[in-house]
Regions:
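A glycine/threonine-rich phosphate-anchoring loop and its flanking beta-alpha core
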Residues: 10, 113-212
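C-terminal charged capping/lid subdomain of soluble metabolic enzymes
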Residues: 304, 314-379
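Short Gly/Thr/Asp-enriched flexible loops that form oxyanion-binding sites at enzyme active sites
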Residues: 52, 82, 101-115, 148-151
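ATP/NTP phosphate-donor binding region
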Residues: 1-92, 337
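Short glycine/serine/threonine-rich phosphate/pyrophosphate-binding segments
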Residues: 19-23, 45-48, 75-78, 100-106, ...
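Active-site segments that bind and position negatively charged phosphate/pyrophosphate groups
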Residues: 202, 206-323
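Glycine/serine-rich anion-binding loops at beta->alpha junctions
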Residues: 90-106, 140-146, 276-279
Length: 379
């Protein structure tokens, strides 16, 4: 895919090799104080950290590190980041990594400009922040599409809730497929399934009559499936990396959701699973999706049949679900909680089910008892 720039509303720089030129241009637009945010040690091990710091120094920036952002970022980590941003009077937060780093920084950007706790501000006062520290994102692990929107998933450890919060849209995001070579293939596979999940969750939202958004969605799903297999077969396949990275962006930039009502119920169940187990997000979705779909597909059998025909090239709805399960096994994702090394007793399963928030949007509104049944089948 050719390099391009795009704004909707995040300013996107996309393409193989675009990283350095794009970052140099963007750094000219912001003040001297940059808070550099990242996750674990891979950024430094691969040398990308040193490259970015050198570019920041060359641009005359003062750099403050905010590292150690975990895969399921916590409210405590958000508060740590916002204190650092305030103390250093950051002019720009530069988030480097995958969805967890981006999610954390979107909320740090908002919390640093709020006097009250952002969790209470959004959930108790029912308000949405409007003032932010500018944010730039350099994507190294695609899949979540987090750089495309202002939503974030944050774990409140005290309340045992992993829930959406609303922060800033990034001012800019750099999507260079070459940078995904800095993360392990296991993470690439998990991220690609998260992309597929975003597309499926949107696709099965109301209305169930096929529209242009759904037709585009079908094409994105087919692309994810094809290019994930291609990349596993050949990790040097730059075209497949590019396609997966742009599919990730398409899954969450809002285009597929136009004209749709969605509840993302599989995500909401997995979020609470993550709140109690700190499990890998993409792997949790892989275990849940086929079992959940077998529970709900008869409530929208015609839509599931179309999905089977257009995405999986088979005739019947249940065949499509079987093919989804086959893909999960083929790419090496887990199919049970046991394979994820997760053990859930009845009390935890009930707690996950009771704390999962599902709003109307999908073809079947799940009850807590149905979620318990699904979780038990996932063991």
């Amino acid at each position: 895919m050719k390099r391009f720039d795009y704004e909707f509303p995040v300013r996107i720089h996309f393409g193989q090799g675009c990283f350095e030129d794009s970052l140099k241009k963007e750094l000219q637009k912001y003040g001297k104080r940059v808070m550099l945010a990242y996750g674990g040690g891979s950024l430094k091990r691969t040398g990308l950290y040193d490259r970015i710091v050198a570019m920041l120094n060359e641009a005359g920036k003062t750099v403050t590190d905010f590292g150690g952002i975990m895969p399921n970022p916590t409210l405590k980590k958000v508060q740590e980041g916002q204190l650092l941003a305030r103390e250093t009077k950051a002019d720009l937060i530069l988030a480097v990594g995958g969805g967890s780093v981006s999610d954390c920084c979107k909320i740090v950007s908002a919390q640093a400009r709020l006097d009250s706790d952002i969790w209470d501000y959004e959930y108790a006062e029912r308000k949405i922040p409007t003032d932010f520290i500018p944010l730039g994102v350099i994507v190294t692990a695609s899949g979540t599409g987090s750089e495309q929107n202002n939503g974030a998933v944050i774990t409140n450890e005290e309340k045992k809730l992993k829930s959406p919060l609303w922060g800033c849209f990034a001012d800019f995001a750099i999507l260079d497929p070459d940078l995904t070579k800095t993360v392990p293939m296991k993470q690439v596979i998990s991220g690609a399934f998260d992309t597929l999940s975003h597309c499926m969750e949107t696709y099965f939202g109301h209305p169930h009559t096929c529209n242009l958004s759904d037709r585009i969605n079908e094409a994105v799903q087919r692309s994810v499936i094809k290019n994930l297999k291609a990349l596993i077969a050949n990790p040097d396949d730059d075209f497949a990396r590019s396609e997966l990275m742009w599919a990730s962006a398409m899954g969450e930039n809002g285009i597929l959701k136009l004209g749709k009502v969605t509840d993302f119920q599989c995500h909401m169940i997995e979020h609470q699973l993550g709140a109690y187990t700190d499990c890998n997000h993409g792997q949790g979705l892989a275990v849940l999706h086929p079992i959940l779909y077998r529970h709900i597909y008869k409530s929208a059998e015609e839509k599931f049949r179309r999905w089977a025909q257009e995405v999986w090239l088979v005739q019947d709805a249940d065949e499509g679900i079987d093919f989804l399960a086959d893909l999960i096994r083929e790419v090496g994702l887990p199919t049970t909680f046991t394979e994820m090394c997760i053990s859930l007793d009845d009390d935890i399963i009930r707690a996950i089910a009771e704390s999962t928030v599902i709003t109307p949007g999908c073809c079947k509104q799940l009850t807590a008892d149905e979620i318990v049944e699904i979780l038990n089948e996932c063991k």
